[in-house]
Amino acid sequence: MKKTVLFLMAMTLLVACSSEEKPFNYRGLPLALSTSQFVDSMKTRGFAVDSAASDSGRTVVFASEAVKYRVLMAFEDEKIKAVQETWRLSTNDSTRQMWQQLRDDLEKELGAWPNCPMLKDDHKVADFDAETGIISVILENTYKPTLTVRYIPKSPRTP
């Protein structure tokens, strides 16, 4: 009897610890960071602020020579509203392949099927509803092949 009670307590503790909510993040950076902390973290990762493309009161755009994408962070006061990664690649096929790979990787990571409101050859959208935010993978091969990954944190629930 004593062993059964200890086993049940251990299982309860294991379940409680494993269901701990992970913060919604962009490439390992929690979106609960303040705007200034996020900017500093991006700078330490080798990104520079593109002041010509940024709006000092609402958005900050980051660029780096080391990667083929730009990152836009939208904010209000010191709170991050969204982070968007935009890839510009040379061919439609490369963006299609990348869209499919990102979609498959997120499906495995989140253990969820995406909502796909648009699934055409050159325009695809996959929305993943994570517990603490929405991740959208968007393909737009119209004038220039463009792939966008958007992270939007959900508002905290009020008790």
Which residues make up each language-model segment?
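Acidic-and-aromatic substrate-binding clefts and catalytic sites of carbohydrate-active enzymes
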Residues: T59-A63
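Mid-chain, structured segments of secreted extracytoplasmic proteins
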Residues: S64-Q100
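Intrinsically disordered, low-complexity boundary segments flanking structured domains
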Residues: M11, V71-L72, H123-K124
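Non-cytosolic coordination micro-motifs
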Residues: E21-D55, R88-P159
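C-terminal motif of bacterial Sec signal peptides marking the signal peptidase cleavage site
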Residues: L13-A16
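Positively charged n-region of N-terminal signal peptides that target proteins for export
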Residues: M1-T4
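Sec-dependent N-terminal signal peptides
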Residues: L6-M9
